[in-house]
Amino acid sequence: MANSFLDSLTLVRQNTPLVQCLTNSVVMQFTANVLLAAGATPAMVDTPAESAEFAAVANGVLINAGTPSAEQYQGMTKAIEGARKAGTPWVLDPVAVGGLSERTKYAEGIVDKQPAAIRGNASEVVALAGLGAGGRGVDATDSVEAALEAAQLLAKRTGGVVAVSGAEDLIVSADRVTWLRSGDPMLQLVIGTGCSLGALTAAYLGATVDSDISAHDAVLAAHAHVGAAGQIAAQKASAPGSFAVAFIDALYDVDAQAVASLVDVREA
């Protein structure tokens, strides 16, 4: 597993993947800083007139309808079309799906457009699979363990990887189930850590798409990178404000061997 982390992180830093982020306004700047610190290049191109064209030249695309508008929905649809036509991996982050009807309807309408990965919390994943009603806004009310069936259903339905974030992360693909223990509770006290993980997942998928690293391992490595950085940041910070700064620094500083040593991975 250490080799997977080493190779994935090396490719991200060597290739500086260009990630098109159609994401929510609350986390846009934080997401861009996370990508830059990790070794990727962010581009917040989300207008309908430009989204498809840009998705064709990007290495990865994030679709995150956390603060959606009618125009952004159109831009997301165009970006997905452009990504699919060009073979660009795209990631769906189903923010607050299940709890709000309009975004739930939209997410349900695009989930069959073959996202390379879906990343959300347990309640979002359960709701997207049609097995539950969603959480409390962006907060999960289901356990990660309870989302296993939903993640497996979505992985089979899309042919992609499904990642469920929590105290222990769950990574599921058609023939694998992996549990990852890492991170720190302080990550939950900084807005944007989850949403930026979706963007970083797109970066890892884009950087490794032409390698022998599987999409499952690329998604796992992205989560491990964030988890390890969270642990390092927690050792240096005493409160959320200083943690946010330390987290960005740790994403930049940490090497693959340190990531592998700080996370606990088990195959189910």
Swiss-Prot record:
Substrate binds at M44, G192. The keyword Nucleotide-binding applies. Keywords: ATP-binding, Kinase, Magnesium, Metal-binding, Nucleotide-binding, Thiamine biosynthesis, Transferase. ATP binds at R119, S165. One of its GO terms (biological process) is thiamine diphosphate biosynthetic process. SUPFAM superfamilies: Ribokinase-like. It catalyses: 5-(2-hydroxyethyl)-4-methylthiazole + ATP = 4-methyl-5-(2-phosphooxyethyl)-thiazole + ADP + H(+). Pfam families: HK (PF02110). Pathway: Cofactor biosynthesis; thiamine diphosphate biosynthesis; 4-methyl-5-(2-phosphoethyl)-thiazole from 5-(2-hydroxyethyl)-4-methylthiazole: step 1/1. Its EC number is 2.7.1.50. Its cofactor is Mg(2+). Transmembrane segments: none annotated. Catalyzes the phosphorylation of the hydroxyl group of 4-methyl-5-beta-hydroxyethylthiazole (THZ). NCBIfam families: PRK09355.1. Belongs to the Thz kinase family. HAMAP family: Thz_kinase (MF_00228). This is Hydroxyethylthiazole kinase. It comes from Corynebacterium glutamicum (strain R). The lineage of its organism: Bacteria, Bacillati, Actinomycetota, Actinomycetes, Mycobacteriales.
